[in-house]
Amino acid sequence: MTVAVKNFSSIMNQMRDAYTGEQTTEFSLAAFIGLQAPSLSDAPDELQKLTQEYQENVNSFYVQEELDLKENVKQLENDKNQTAFFENMRKKKEEALKKSEDMINKYYDSLIDFGEEHPSSQTLILTIADKVGAFIQDIMDKVLNVFVTVVETVKNAISAAINFISSTFNSIVSTTKNFFSSLF
């Protein structure tokens, strides 16, 4: 079940390209290897360690993103500067995407190196890389959606407040007119 080393790097790079950025490109591992996926329980300890380190980096990344987002929202609450908030959210979204891509690139590079050193594990590595890449792409879509939803929520809250003010004062003006017109 060995994939030739020269094809291995190419497949890994095509897979990486499919799972980075805001793309929704589907990657079909079966189209490349034409084999049934090996059991992931057969993964060598070193390969499991590489994947565990990646998981720890990803978890730290998500914790930091959550803290940064909360801080940005608190800053809006304190400073009341919408323009700075929206700009900061845009920058944070771009930074999050870049950090995610950097992490997956580092992970895929380490998998390529490992696979070139251990050709007998290449099919297994391709299977793991495909599963991890697809999962991280789905999760990053959710992370990026948080940025969009927070901005939309703030904009909607501001719009709702303005509509409430307008509606309330229109009602007050109307009630006042009706009151005074009923006096005489």
Report each predicted region and the residues it spans.
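Membrane- and interface-active hydrophobic/amphipathic segments that mediate membrane binding, fusion
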Residues: Y108-F184
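Extracellular, luminal, or virion-exposed ectodomains of exported proteins
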Residues: M1-S120, D130
